[in-house]
Amino acid sequence: MKVLVSFEIKFKTNKEKIISILKHFGFRRMQENLYFGDVEYDELYAMQSDIMENIREYDSILTIPICKSCYLKLNVFGRNLSFKDELYKIF
């Protein structure tokens, strides 16, 4: 499943831990605090568990699953992001 992860992390060390977790699960950076990945349901839950163990009460993280229909409607404005990469291929 395609997933966007957006976060606001107060301290750099916590942010580095979250980024490390996202990279471990194959997520790639799209913007400063926005990552995109393609994971199975069990991987998503494992990733969310790892993240929950490493965030603080003042941090916020949003995971957004993207269905095939919504992914097909994706628009990119401004700086061009390449969706030709294998990670971004449609289901």
Curated annotation (Swiss-Prot):
Q: What is its EC number?
A: 3.1.-.-
Q: Which domain of life is it from?
A: Archaea
What does the record give as cofactor? Answer: Mg(2+)
Q: Which GO terms describe its biological process?
A: defense response to virus; maintenance of CRISPR repeat elements
- Keyword Iron-sulfur listed? The answer is no
Per UniProt, where does Mg(2+) bind?
Answer: 10
| Subunit-structure text | Homodimer, forms a heterotetramer with a Cas1 homodimer.
Q: What is this protein called?
A: CRISPR-associated endoribonuclease Cas2
Q: Which cysteine-cysteine pairs are annotated as disulfide bonds in the entry?
A: none
Keywords carried by this UniProt record: Antiviral defense, Endonuclease, Hydrolase, Magnesium, Metal-binding, Nuclease
Identify the InterPro entries for this entry. Answer: CRISPR_associated_Cas2, Virulence_VapD/CRISPR_Cas2
Instruction: Kindly list the GO molecular function terms attached to this UniProt entry.
Output: metal ion binding; RNA endonuclease activity
Q: Which family does it belong to?
A: Belongs to the CRISPR-associated endoribonuclease Cas2 protein family.
Gene3D superfamilies xref list:
3.30.70.240
Q: Which NCBIfam families match?
A: cas2 (TIGR01573)
Give the function comment from the record.
CRISPR (clustered regularly interspaced short palindromic repeat), is an adaptive immune system that provides protection against mobile genetic elements (viruses, transposable elements and conjugative plasmids). CRISPR clusters contain sequences complementary to antecedent mobile elements and target invading nucleic acids. CRISPR clusters are transcribed and processed into CRISPR RNA (crRNA). Functions as a ssRNA-specific endoribonuclease. Involved in the integration of spacer DNA into the CRISPR cassette.
What is the uppermost EC class here? hydrolase
- Asked if the record carries the keyword Nuclease, the reply is yes
